[in-house]
Amino acid sequence: MITLMGCGSKEGELETNTKVTESEVKETTQNNTKENDMSEVTFDYTTLDDGTLSIWSYNAENVPEVFEIPEEIDGQTVSEIRGSLFASEDKIKEVIILETVTSIGKETFQLATSIEKIEIRGNVEELGDYAFFACKGIKELRFNEGLKYIGKSAISNNDNLTDLYLPSTVEDVSGTTNFGSQSDILRIHVPAGSAAESLVTDAVKDADCNIEVIAE
């Protein structure tokens, strides 16, 4: 049982009204638009054998704080991100990966320092080696059903990562170096009774850090 405690205003407590001017609202809207503006971002990519695109770099004079991977470029579907796309990133705070992406390649987010949130909306099937290695700002990672392969040290050395959600579809966790070297406890959530539960439990049994596998 988990007991939750919250804080709120007491009954009868006076509310404070804050007057917001029209200019303040306009300025806030403009700032939010600038932070999320992808209009000036261009990408370097490769066309794969199936005709879909693999993005490996981006170009932008003004880097948006919220960065969205497009579903398509010039009518071609984006299925992969790779090649240190966000490696050592120090400006972007949030990355949104849309539904078409099925592969996050080698070293894609390695050593990113500014990224605090990664939202994966689709069914990513594989994580390349060191894909999320030493991403210092990430506290939570969630993968949807469909993830099958987790490469060597793909999720490792993330000092602030406390919760990792893996689906029942995980079939291969490459090596025991995954999930290691967290500074505090890492809770790995997996579906109870799934093959993923056994795989992950086996992968972390000799880990040199505090990892808890939670079957739910």
Cite the ranges covered by each PLM segment:
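Short secondary-structure subsegments characteristic of cysteine-rich extracellular domains
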Residues: 1, 86-89
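C-terminal motif of bacterial Sec signal peptides marking the signal peptidase cleavage site
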Residues: 3-6
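N-terminal, intrinsically disordered, polar/charged segments of Gram-positive cell-envelope systems
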Residues: 11-40
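Short beta-strand/loop segment at the start of cytosolic alpha/beta domains
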Residues: 31-59
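Structural signature of tandem-repeat unit edges
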Residues: 42-51, 62-79, 90-103, 113-126, ...
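Consensus positions within tandem repeat domains that build extended binding/scaffold surfaces
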Residues: 83-85, 105-108, 128-131, 151-154, ...
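Alpha-helix boundary recognition
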Residues: 87, 110, 133, 156, ...
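Short, aromatic/basic amphipathic alpha-helical patches
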Residues: 177, 195-210
